[in-house]
């Protein structure tokens, strides 16, 4: 039996001549934490609104529990939304904000009392029922918005950048709370953000969006370690992306040298892009590593130094090191074959997955 609760099949959305969603195909399973991740204008919030019923799609189908819901009004869908600005009613106290939807459903006073108390307990706001919204911190207001959304017991909770208005420390605290809440509730969360660190920390699965298309989907580890294209490699974390050629399976050439790698399934001498993450580079004395770079600048980031250098071919290198380097000095860089990730130019996610299965199965 399938546990897919939401599915988008060949979904497109146009505003006049502008195509904002292009052939979107995604499957969302019950009880998991999903994230739509991408820059502004990538289409992630449009997908959220299409699932919620706040807009009509131009092409394709939106399915809920296997049934087409394109024509089902928003108030009849088994989803609820937490908005970026929380959309709380300032003239109502905490209890009445959370109870608002229950009253629209004409529930009894006793049922409303019980459900509101349970929802506030779930978000750790016991004792706040009589507080005015203006008396609450940003984090507390966000919890009220979540309580109002979950009190109606939706099967899917949609969250549209709910942490964006919070300061850095509170955002991190709320990440833990959101993840814990999702696990306690056991319902599906679909979270929208442009913050890749948030997405990596929270998600069971991420859909990376750009220009109205899903560039890649997968677990945070898969997407970080195996980006399918230049956009994903550059957008998720920080990367050194260098032009090269795939000499043969498990051997790649860049910077005028050949290196063993863990990739295969490409044409001999095919042009490729090589990805090396800054944290995978170790600094050695000059001429004792695999690449020499001249240190240009460095910044202290608290638990590491962020060092920028340039090789003889003027490629920029970003290095994360626990030890500082001296501006202007030449150092060596070393890395393991498994640290090298080779990307074909313009390879689709489908072709990437097929190639990966072929050579990993050998």
UniProtKB/Swiss-Prot annotation:
Domain annotation ABC transporter: ranges: 6-236
InterPro entries: AAA+_ATPase, ABC_SmlMolc_Importer, ABC_transporter-like_ATP-bd, ABC_transporter-like_CS, Mo/tungstate-bd_C_term_dom, P-loop_NTPase, PotA_ATP-bd, Transp-assoc_OB_typ2
Entry-linked PROSITE patterns: ABC_TRANSPORTER_1 (PS00211), ABC_TRANSPORTER_2 (PS50893), POTA (PS51305)
GO MF, any single term: ABC-type putrescine transporter activity
Broad class of enzyme this protein falls into: translocase
Main location: membrane
Cellular localisation: Cell membrane
Enzyme Commission number, as recorded: 7.6.2.11
Gene3D superfamilies: 2.40.50.100, P-loop containing nucleotide triphosphate hydrolases
Origin superkingdom: Bacteria
Residues the record lists as binding ATP: 38-45
Membrane topology: Peripheral membrane protein
SMART domains hit by this protein: AAA
One Pfam family named in its UniProt record: TOBE_2
CDD domains, A to Z: ABC_PotA_N (cd03300)
Catalysed conversion reaction: ATP + H2O + polyamine-[polyamine-binding protein]Side 1 = ADP + phosphate + polyamineSide 2 + [polyamine-binding protein]Side 1
Keywords tagged on the record: ATP-binding, Cell membrane, Membrane, Nucleotide-binding, Translocase, Transport
GO cellular component: ATP-binding cassette (ABC) transporter complex
Record note on quaternary structure: The complex is composed of two ATP-binding proteins (PotA), two transmembrane proteins (PotB and PotC) and a solute-binding protein (PotD).
Family, per entry: Belongs to the ABC transporter superfamily. Spermidine/putrescine importer (TC 3.A.1.11.1) family.
Function statement: Part of the ABC transporter complex PotABCD involved in spermidine/putrescine import. Responsible for energy coupling to the transport system.
PANTHER family, A to Z: SPERMIDINE/PUTRESCINE IMPORT ATP-BINDING PROTEIN POTA, SPERMIDINE_PUTRESCINE IMPORT ATP-BINDING PROTEIN POTA
Entry protein name: Spermidine/putrescine import ATP-binding protein PotA
């Amino acid at each position: 039996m399938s546990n897919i609760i939401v599915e988008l099949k060949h979904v497109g959305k146009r505003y006049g001549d502008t195509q904002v969603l292009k052939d979107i195909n995604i499957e969302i399973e019950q009880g998991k934490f999903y994230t739509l991740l991408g820059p502004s204008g990538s289409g992630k919030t449009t997908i959220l609104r299409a699932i919620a019923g706040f807009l009509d799609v131009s092409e394709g189908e939106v399915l809920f529990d296997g049934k087409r819901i394109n024509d089902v009004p928003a108030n009849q869908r088994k989803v609820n939304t937490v908005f970026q600005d929380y959309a709380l009613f300032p003239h109502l106290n905490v209890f009445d904000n959370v109870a608002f939807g229950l009253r629209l459903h004409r529930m009894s006073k006793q049922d409303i009392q019980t459900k509101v108390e349970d929802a506030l307990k779930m978000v750790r706001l016991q004792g706040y029922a009589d507080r005015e919204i203006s008396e609450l911190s940003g984090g507390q207001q966000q919890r009220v918005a979540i309580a109002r959304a979950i009190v109606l017991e939706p099967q899917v909770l949609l969250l549209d950048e709910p942490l964006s208005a919070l300061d850095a420390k509170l955002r991190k605290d709320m990440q833990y709370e959101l993840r814990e809440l999702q696990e306690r509730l056991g319902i599906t969360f679909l979270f929208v953000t442009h913050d890749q660190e948030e997405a990596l920390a929270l998600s069971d699965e991420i859909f990376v969006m750009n220009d109205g298309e899903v560039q890649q989907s997968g677990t945070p580890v898969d997407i970080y370690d195996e980006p399918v294209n230049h956009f994903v490699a550059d957008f998720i974390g920080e990367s050194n992306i260098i032009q090269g050629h795939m000499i043969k399976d498990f051997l790649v050439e860049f910077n005028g040298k050949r290196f063993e790698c863990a990739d295969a399934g490409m044409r001999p001498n095919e042009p490729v892009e090589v990805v090396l993450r800054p944290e995978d580079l170790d600094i050695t004395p000059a001429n004792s590593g695999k690449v020499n770079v001249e240190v240009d600048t460095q910044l202290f980031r608290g638990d590491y130094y962020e060092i920028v250098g340039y090789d003889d071919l003027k490629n920029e290198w970003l290095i994360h090191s626990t030890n500082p380097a001296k501006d202007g000095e030449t150092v060596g860089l070393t890395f393991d074959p498994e640290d090298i990730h080779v990307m074909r130019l313009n390879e689709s996610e489908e072709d990437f997955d097929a190639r990966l299965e072929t050579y990993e199965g050998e």
